[in-house]
């Protein structure tokens, strides 16, 4: 029978509850419970590690090759300080220089020709030569030929005018002679009419050269015996005088007809000659203007070719467009040719305490899940010192498409970094280091679960 007094014995409890299984299982159980609870609630950072280098936040200039010619002089060097206008690369430029010089010579020749044409045009407008001497293109001779044609037209008009004046003078002389004859005839007619009047009125005329006719009539009339005889004498005398009057009147009419038959041309108009001169002037001006337009078109074409040739010639020299520090995208120092359009170098801004910096790095596409802008990064410089440079920053840009590098694909990331004045003194462009990007956090339970399931992101 079990003795109850043993229940109060410490030895009983010690032997019953402080055995080996009890001391091992309980702590292990508690440890497992703690680990499970820790893995469910405790979190760890999910990071992506990559290699990166420090670059400026803003590149001043990307310089590309401007010629396919062989390199004549190469002044490129990594981290070399350059000033604006410094020569970086020169290419061989034999053909480009000759072409530019020939085009310049042709353009100068065309400019001189157009200037001579303009002088020729203004000479025509002003009607006098504005050439200071012999024109090298012969436009002074062309103007002299034009003026000779104008002088010919003017001389023709002057000759016509002179001939007209001579003809008019001859006509006026003929008219004067006829009028003089008509005047004498009219005077005779007046005298005969006066005799006729005297016979009719039996009044003796005075100062009349034909008074003898009246005197003869008066004598016959006096010798007549009868009235009929007197009447007969009178009628005979009147008839004789009337015949003379009729003859003189006919002669006077003949003079009028002759005078009327002598015609003179009207005033000789110069408008026809002036019109011919004006037409000639317009033809010459139109011809000169057309030639000016043609030459100007040729000049524009040559200038376009010259501009292209000058660009080709200028393209044989690459100069720094900004002051800064050179960064070579690859080793360009020993290359003999830069294909046109390829990037030769970049110009970074001068490093000072105000220079904003970034870190450029590449993340494999296999680790890109969850990567986004605004995530924090930490940059640890590859420096052989006890305390390397550590910088923090934030992702600003992620390339929209992966980049193939050595048959592997990466996403390009650029993160802005925070740098104080002391840290600036330790930094140079191209300083390499390790970049750790914090993509987020997850519990330890989910972390190991993802490892077991093969999800490494």
Curated annotation (Swiss-Prot):
First-listed, main subcellular location of the protein, grouped into a coarse class: membrane
Keywords: Bacteriocin transport, Membrane, Plasmid, Protein transport, Transmembrane, Transmembrane helix, Transport
Compartments, record wording: Membrane
GO cellular component, one term: membrane
GO terms under biological process: bacteriocin transport; protein secretion
Highest taxon, organism lineage: Bacteria
Membrane topology type: Single-pass membrane protein
Function, in words: Involved in the secretion of mesentericin Y105.
Family: Belongs to the membrane fusion protein (MFP) (TC 8.A.1) family.
Protein name stated in the entry: Mesentericin Y105 secretion protein MesE
Organism annotation: Leuconostoc mesenteroides
Upper lineage: Bacteria, Bacillati, Bacillota, Bacilli, Lactobacillales
């Amino acid at each position: 029978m079990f003795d109850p007094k043993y229940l109060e014995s410490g030895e009983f409890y010690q032997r019953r509850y402080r055995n080996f299984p009890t001391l091992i299982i309980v702590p292990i159980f508690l440890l497992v419970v703690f680990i499970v609870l820790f893995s469910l609630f405790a979190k760890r950072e999910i990071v992506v590690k990559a290699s990166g280098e420090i670059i400026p936040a803003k590149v001043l200039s990307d310089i590309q090759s401007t010629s396919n010619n062989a390199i004549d002089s190469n002044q490129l060097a990594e981290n070399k300080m350059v000033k604006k206008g410094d020569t970086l690369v020169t290419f061989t430029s034999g053909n480009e220089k000759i072409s530019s010089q020939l085009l310049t010579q042709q353009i100068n020749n065309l400019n001189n020709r157009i200037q001579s044409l303009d002088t020729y045009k203004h000479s025509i407008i002003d009607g006098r030569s504005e050439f200071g001497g012999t024109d090298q293109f012969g436009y002074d001779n062309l103007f002299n030929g034009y003026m000779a044609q104008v002088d010919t037209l003017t001389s023709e008009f002057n000759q016509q005018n002179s001939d007209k004046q001579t003809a008019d003078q001859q006509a006026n002389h003929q008219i004067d002679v006829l009028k003089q004859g008509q005047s004498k005839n009219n005077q005779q007619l007046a005298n005969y009419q006066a005799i006729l009047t005297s016979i009719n009125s039996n009044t003796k005329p005075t100062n009349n050269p034909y008074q003898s006719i009246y005197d003869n009539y008066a004598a016959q009339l006096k010798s007549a015996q009868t009235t009929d005889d007197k009447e007969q004498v009178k009628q005979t005398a009147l008839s004789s005088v009337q015949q003379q009057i009729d003859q003189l009147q006919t002669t006077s009419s003949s003079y009028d007809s002759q005078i009327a038959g002598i015609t003179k041309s009207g005033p000789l108009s110069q408008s026809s000659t002036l019109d011919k001169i004006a037409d000639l002037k317009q033809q010459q001006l139109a011809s000169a203007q057309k030639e000016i337009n043609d030459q100007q078109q040729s000049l524009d074409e040559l200038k376009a070719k010259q501009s292209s040739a000058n660009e080709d010639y200028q393209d044989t020299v690459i100069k720094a467009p900004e002051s800064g520090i050179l960064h070579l995208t690859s080793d360009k120092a020993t290359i003999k040719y830069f294909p046109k359009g390829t990037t030769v170098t970049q110009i970074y801004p001068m490093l000072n305490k105000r220079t904003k910096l970034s870190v450029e790095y590449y993340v494999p596409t296999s680790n890109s899940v969850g990567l986004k802008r605004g995530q924090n990064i930490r940059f640890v410089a590859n420096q052989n010192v006890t305390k390397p440079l550590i910088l923090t920053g934030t992702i600003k840009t992620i390339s929209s498409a992966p980049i193939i590098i050595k048959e592997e694909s990466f996403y390009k990331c650029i993160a802005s970094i925070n740098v104080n004045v002391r840290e600036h003194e330790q930094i140079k462009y191209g300083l390499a280091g390790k970049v750790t990007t914090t993509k987020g956090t997850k519990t330890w339970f989910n972390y190991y679960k993802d490892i077991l399931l093969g999800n490494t992101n």
